[in-house]
C-alpha cells in the first residue's frame, strides 16, 4: 500500500516514511474531536476492538481525561504531546497499560501513530 486507506482483508501493506505519507493529498482525514483529526488505518468505526490511526493535533488541541480498556501504543512522528507523566517528542514511543487514565495535550501540535487494543472511556477525574 502506498497511500492512505486501509488494506483489504488478509492483505499486508507497508508505509515507508510514514510522516511524509500523511502530507499526500490522498491521505484522507476526518475530525475526531475539535483540533484533532484522524486517518484510520484499520479497525471499526465504533472503536470496538483493535484500532490503528494516525492522529494530527492542532496547536493547543487536547483529548480529555479518559481510561484505556487495553494497551495503548503511541509513536510520536512529529511535534510533541504531553500528559500527567511527561512530554513526548518526535521519535518517542509510549506504551500505556490497560487501566491507564490521562488527558493528552499538544501545545505545539503533533502527528502520532496510535494503536489501541480496546476502546477508551471518557471519565471524570
Predicted regions and their residues:
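A short, N-terminal "cap"/entry segment at the start of jelly-roll beta-barrel domains
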Residues: 1-49, 125
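Conserved hydrophobic/aromatic beta-strand scaffold that supports enzyme active sites
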Residues: 38-40, 52-54, 73, 93-95, ...
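Short histidine-centered beta-strand/loop micro-motifs
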Residues: 43, 53-55, 64-68, 85-86, ...
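Structural motif
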Residues: 50-52, 110-111
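Glycine- and acidic-residue-biased ligand/ion/polar-headgroup-sensing regions
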Residues: 58-61, 68-83, 90
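Short acidic-glycine-tyrosine-enriched beta hairpin
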Residues: 82-106
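Ligand-binding loop in jelly-roll beta-barrel domains
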Residues: 98-123
